[in-house]
Amino acid sequence: MPPNPTGPTNSQLRMLARFLRKAARANSASIWRVVAEFVEKPRRQRVIVNVGKLNRVAKEGDVVVVPGKLLAGGQLNKKIIVAAVKISPKAARKVIEAGGEVLTIPELVRKYPRGSGVRIVI
């Protein structure tokens, strides 16, 4: 291992990135490759999104992937499907209370293998 690793040393994140790259190749869906690139970033550059931002950028019924952590800041009043690397319990509760659905990223890839209609929020 190099003296200063610049990617994830977390084995689960590395496996997730590998899974996303394989899904991108198998399904000819470049969205999963882009998500893998975000997942592989160093810790200081990882994505953190609040629920309030989802409320601003997503439309009713959207499918959204957050290639990082989803936190509970703000309000959500739209029914959306959200997948993220990590989701705080309060954020998950807010999404579910708004009528949405919370998935893991692998579940989202299996549900939408081509990535059609999936939006990346960073």
UniProtKB/Swiss-Prot annotation:
One of its GO terms (biological process) is translation. Pfam families: Ribosomal_L18. Transmembrane segments: none annotated. SUPFAM superfamilies: Ribosomal proteins L15p and L18e (SSF52080). This is Large ribosomal subunit protein eL18. Disulfide bonds: none annotated. The keyword Ribonucleoprotein applies. InterPro entries: Ribosomal_eL18 (IPR000039), Ribosomal_eL18_arc (IPR022947), Ribosomal_uL15/eL18 (IPR021131), Ribosomal_uL15/eL18_sf (IPR036227), Ribosomal_uL15_CS (IPR001196). The gene is rpl18e. Belongs to the eukaryotic ribosomal protein eL18 family. GO terms for cellular component: cytosolic large ribosomal subunit. One of its GO terms (molecular function) is structural constituent of ribosome. It comes from Pyrobaculum aerophilum (strain ATCC 51768 / DSM 7523 / JCM 9630 / CIP 104966 / NBRC 100827 / IM2). Keywords: Ribonucleoprotein, Ribosomal protein.
